[in-house]
Amino acid sequence: MAIIGIDLGTTNSLVSYWKEGTVKLIPNSMGSVLTPSVVSVMQDEIFVGQSAKERGLTHGSETAASFKRFMGTKKKYQLGSQIFTPTELSALVLKKLKQDAEAYLNEPVEEAIITVPAYFNDRQRTDTKLAAKMAGIHVERLINEPSAAALAYQTARNQEDAVLLVLDFGGGTLDISVVECFENVIEIEAVSGDNHLGGDDVDQLLYKDFMEKHSELSLLDEEGAAGLRTALTEAKCALGKQDKLMVSYTYGTSTVEDYITQEQLLELGLPILERIRHLCAQAMRDAKCKENEIDDVIMVGGSSQLYFVQRFIEELFDRPPVVMDKTDKVVARGAGIYAGIRMRAADIKDRMMTDVCPFTLGTNVVWDKEDDRPHICPVLERNCPLPFSKTIQLYTTGDYQELMRVGIYQGEAYYADENVCLGELLIGVRRRLAGQEGIRVTFSYDINGVLQVEAENAMHQVVKKLIVNDALSEKEIEESLIQLEQLKMPDKETEEYALIHAKLEWLYQQQTGTARNQTAGMLYHLKTTREEGKHHLYVKVKEEAKQWLVQASMYLDAFEPEN
């Protein structure tokens, strides 16, 4: 029975495990350690990963991506005739990762360590654990992504004592943490972040700018727009440290060409960089840590590879940041190391990881009877160490009051209703004059970020509430499980077929004339030989299709302008 580490990412997800003194990444059924966090539905079959990503170029209405950004919300995704929540889509990704891990390790997965953004709130953490439950994965511990990154850094550098600022800039989230490492302890001092800021936002800015410069693209349909977004994203990643890179996009019989430049990215990304500056300052302020007390600034996450972001961080801290090798794999490595610790592997040093509460948790109180809007009374302030428990005393505000309603809120706003309401407790009290009767309210927050609130009145009657933040009922979970089980997760052969078919469909859209007809013929023969069970002929056609894809791609690339 194996324990694995999972980096459930906005753009890509990874699986890792500890073996023979090192952490290893597990390849998926397509041979890659990166599994795109993309889901696509085709009738009663569900595709997850690269095949789903390719289908998204030509079947956008049946495909969903970047749904991690909406964990903890009630957003719905309609894929074909089916409707999914972000939690259900995440469950499908986790199910695929578990299947690939079990196939590779040749043993069942007993448990998973799943990483989450440090700035994930209670709802988002609860939904992540629920997604794991739907995928048939037992999760004892969620760990924050910067904690995992710090663990990977400390293990790689064999560095015991250090104060680190970890900047985790992914596809859809930004986490900034001040981390202190000493002896065998990795202690989070403070976190800040934005759950809706990442590389996807850079992509959107590039897309908007490109569309404004090229009005001839205004009539692009959904699939054409998806193709352009993909081309711009690939160019952004390929730019590296070059000053500029040509983007060439073909739609129908027309081709549009333009450069993307470092200067352009810097100009478009100024609001993002200013947000990063503000969040770095907030984390350091909360940690009571000055710039000269930071030993290293660690950059992880796929979007940390963007050179204009690296330059900004270097200017901000007056030193080059440590950009971890393969930034998009660092968090997964940290999760795998922690999986080894959970397994009590003899060849790994035991480490204790502490976390903090990312948001203030409190209740609603009335300070002034003239003001009918309750204020927030902080109970656990942001960045208090976990686990943490605190008790406060609350009193009635009305004469002969029989009930007290305790709202439970998360956030930093002054007025209670401007924060996120996690739930409420109702508890009876003795009828007395205002202020003469009270209750004791205890907030307890554990290391996994699970909150329990307890209220006790003068008669020692206790009302407990485990906050699960609008989590589904057992009946709703069962209904979701039934829906997901009805969708068939394809085997390796079907997944490979879907990947080739999706690539051929995309190629068909790029071509004209004879080449397009050849691709159409390839699509037809690939489909019919498979459906008719002509195995030997299908294998032959499949290999021909692979060769055709390579040749056609080389032909298209020949028309790309020199940078």
Language-model regions, residue ranges each:
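Oxyanion-binding/catalytic loops of NTP- or PPi-dependent enzymes
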Residues: 1-73, 77-83, 92, 99-563
